Amino acid sequence: MQQMLQEKGYTIVPFDETADIYIVNTCTVTNIADRKSRQMLHRAKQKNPAALVVAVGCYVQTGREDVEQDPCIDLAIGNNRKKDLASILEEYLQDLEQEDAVAENAENAGHGVDKTLHDTTVIDINHTAEYEEMTLKQTAEHTRAYIKIQDGCNQFCSYCVIPYARGRVRSRRAEDIIREITGMAQNGYREIVLTGIHISSYGIDFDEEAWKRGESVSVLKEDEERRDYSGSSKLIDLLERIHTIEGIERIRIGSLEPRIITEETAVRMAALPKLCPHFHLSLQSGCDATLRRMNRKYTSEEYAESVALLRKVFDHPAITTDVIVGFPGETEEEFAQTVGFLDRIQFFEMHIFKYSKRAGTRAAVMSHQVPDPVKTTRSAELLAMEKEQSKQFRTHYVGREAEVLLEETKEIGGTEYLLGHTRDYVKLAVSVKENKKNVANTVICGRVQGFLTDEILLLSPLEFSK
């Protein structure tokens, strides 16, 4: 959206500066996200009461009634019209000018004009069957580009509002993805991350015959959510095509469903040297009874098998995950099963969330809601476990050689360092004094000396790669 506005002549300023137009890309994944979205919108109006405040994104989709009644929001745009933001703004501003002119003429003629009412204009929040194409040329980061490959989700986990906010699965045409990544490579980006709402579903909405002809034609299928992931996954097909793009040296993939990892997909991924051995496999719970209530589509044992397959074909891959504690009905025994499972798998990183109700979801009306103090206790236990497992994973690299893509400069303990990540996303630091070139977006090799901080390892450089 920022890119489109700049191309139309708008000047982008930091959010805390006074602006004529404020655009807040809202989130609704949790109640906290809702609240933060509202706070940002209200801050904008307080900063400049005369400014046009625009809400776009998921909160607009799920909270239409609240959005329409919020006096701080002037214009609300649904997810499927983000690509039209610039033209919508221009049309809206033209309408305002016309209304002001009419009001001025009326006042000059001695007629009163009622300006006390507030109306929020809501632009199309209905979901579409097609992917909303928005191609990026550059991103805020200078070394890593995030490439969106699909939108929507068909899973309908019992705690999640995202399918209602983002709609059904819509996959982006492979041709558009390849073109965007090629452009990013030409602009100097060396690493890309494939993102989406549910990227394991990439391509399930494509017409099979069209795909065989090399075309990506999106179609609606009644049984989309029942289609299984297999070794012929369109996601793996896409990875293989991206792998051939010159200039891209690292490919990362976003969150995956465990069942997409089969023997065949694991082998195909391992055959791609550019693919980073860094996999986020969504878990949520290590207890099968809890997983069933969550409407997750796998068992804990199936999850463990997926991890084993990745560890079989990749050398020491980084496995990360999400875990929800305090889901409705989670007993002490069920939580203990999750603790045991997490200890068995051993992750690089875990994102721990305390369950919170989302209006309109099945979980919100389930019986046996877990008290907040219990959630807090369970969360603290898993956070302590996460810290220990993460340290153990990083310790593996001490004394070993590693390759890092330098990204930014930061001062730590009075010393200036260049920071970057390994292929499996371990953060390393090299002293600027030792790095004579002092250039971000440079790949260097070195030996890991030890821990600089709890989360950053210190690298002694051996050579610059390129």
What is each residue range found by the language model?
Residues 354-368:
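Aromatic/acidic polysaccharide-binding cleft in carbohydrate-active enzymes
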Residues 1-202, 209, 216, 234, ...:
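Proteins enriched for Cys/Gly/acidic motifs involved in redox and nucleic-acid/cofactor modification
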Residues 330, 345-347:
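Contiguous mid-protein beta-loop-alpha structural module that forms a pocket-lining wall or clamp
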Residues 365-466:
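Terminal RNA-binding accessory module
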Residues 157, 177, 194, 253, ...:
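Conserved, mostly hydrophobic/aromatic
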Residues 53-54, 62, 186-332:
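Conserved SAM/AdoMet-binding glycine-rich loop
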Residues 85, 279-281, 350, 406, ...:
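OB-fold and OB-like beta-barrel modules that bind single-stranded nucleic acids
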